[in-house]
Structure formats: structure tokens, C-alpha cells
């Protein structure tokens, strides 16, 4: 009986803690997030071989770009942005994991590791776009 009481008390504390959190508010549109944050940040990772950082300052910028990719995945999972709790969240989690790994690789200045995670990052983009972006991959109509 004690574990049940403890569990109920813990659930009450957690519910109170989440209700004390200030509400989030989406400021930009999905297009704003993609075009102004995610695309430029992910491009820095996708094109690492042709735009390899040479200085500590450039590596710091790349680490920031990788961090933007990872944290943008968290933004995509917020209420009001997440389209569903299954596929959308799975795609965002792929992006989060690839971005987090890119942050770790950038801290080590490991170009090869960033190149190696490109496929994972691209998979998160393409599967999400196929499912949620109308006409993705289709030729434009004349």
C-alpha cells in the first residue's frame, strides 16, 4: 500500500511542477523555423567537407549550428507544433539525436564523425517531409 501512496504523491508533485511552468508560445511559423533556422544550420553540417572549419572560432560557429539543429528538434516537438505523437515525434527524435551527435563531434573537431551522421540527419528530414509536407519530391506543375 505504501508504494501506491508514494506513487500518487509523486504524481501530484509532478503535476504541480508542470502547471507552475510558464506556457510556451509559438512565435514563428513552421516555414520560419525551417527556412531561417533549420535549413541554414543543417547545411553547415551537410556541407562540412567543402566548408571545413579551420579556426577555433569557425569550429565554435559550427558547434552552434549543430546545437541549433538539435534544439530545433525540441521546438518541433512542442505542443502546437507536433502534428502527431507517433511519426512526427519519431522524425524529430532522429533529428535531435543526429544534432546532439553533431554537437559532440564539433566539440572534438571531428569532420569524419559529422560526415558519418549526414545520412541520419537527412533521413529525419526526408521522412518528415514525405509525411507532412504536401507535394514533397514531386515535380512542380507547369
What is each stretch, according to the model?
Residues 1-3:
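Positively charged n-region of N-terminal signal peptides that target proteins for export
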Residues 5-17:
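Hydrophobic h-region of N-terminal signal peptides that target proteins for export
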Amino acid at each position: 500500500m505504501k508504494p501506491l501512496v508514494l506513487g500518487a504523491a509523486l504524481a501530484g508533485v509532478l503535476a504541480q511542477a508542470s502547471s507552475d511552468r510558464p506556457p510556451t508560445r509559438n512565435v514563428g511559423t513552421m516555414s520560419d523555423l525551417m527556412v531561417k533556422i533549420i535549413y541554414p544550420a543543417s547545411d553547415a553540417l551537410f556541407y562540412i567537407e567543402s566548408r571545413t572549419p579551420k579556426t577555433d572560432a569557425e569550429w565554435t560557429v559550427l558547434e552552434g549550428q549543430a546545437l541549433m539543429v538539435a534544439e530545433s528538434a525540441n521546438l518541433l516537438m512542442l505542443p502546437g507544433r507536433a502534428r502527431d505523437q507517433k511519426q512526427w515525434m519519431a522524425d524529430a527524435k532522429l533529428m535531435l539525436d543526429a544534432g546532439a551527435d553533431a554537437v559532440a563531434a564539433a566539440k572534438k573537431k571531428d569532420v569524419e564523425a559529422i560526415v558519418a551522421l549526414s545520412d541520419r540527419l537527412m533521413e529525419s528530414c526526408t521522412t518528415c517531409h514525405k509525411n507532412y509536407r504536401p507535394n514533397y519530391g514531386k515535380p512542380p506543375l507547369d
